[in-house]
Amino acid sequence: MWGQQVGQGMDISYSFYDQSSTFTYTTSALTTAFGDGIKAVIQDCFDTLSSLTLLNFSLLEETQNQVGDIRLGYQAGPSYGAAFGPAQWSSDSYGGDIYFKTEAFESWESATSGDFYYATVYHEIGHAIGLEHPHSEGHYADSLVFGSNSDVGSGARDAQPYTLMSYAAYQGGGLGYADDQRAQTFMVDDIAALQYLYGSNLTTNTGSNIYGSQTLTLDKPFETTVWDAGGIDLIDWRHGTLASIIDLSP
């Protein structure tokens, strides 16, 4: 995790790879700059994290002598995305750095909420701030893992309806995502882990809010979680055209 004590917030800077700066540990050159599309998704993710926790994120312009705590860039390679956890390379500057596959440039730049690329941005940033896969045994020293079963999909909550960090589309599912249904944001177990690590933002959605078919994207199946810190709220699905499952479990 970032910081020295659980439950505490902090300021974290992030920067986009610039060709005037360097990634000394990469196996291939980072020669493609981020476009506005993926930058917007990344900013949305950091805004979401700030609304959930006491973390504050700020964008830093890279120079040869100055880079963010978290660095993001495109890199050629077999994986669509990869991230160094904050404690994985504690003696180096690698912790928190993220790269996305250059060959999928067009897809990253056109990513939309609920698709594979949008979810992968959130997933990799999740790793960078200290979340592990629920099926992993804790490869990063400070990463928080829900459950301890190493078989993908066999854990009762190892599924995307509970955590964006899961590789399973549904409970009991194996490795792989559903083509048309992915978590749109950090899910309930992710939020519990994040708030344990970095505290809860109790100023988010404290009024009387309405959530439902008038405010959510409904053109395909989706999974989402709402963090609401107070007020008298309403979930309204009167205008929905798809069947829904609403889970109010604490």
List where the protein language model places each region.
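Zinc-dependent metalloendopeptidases
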Residues: 1-250
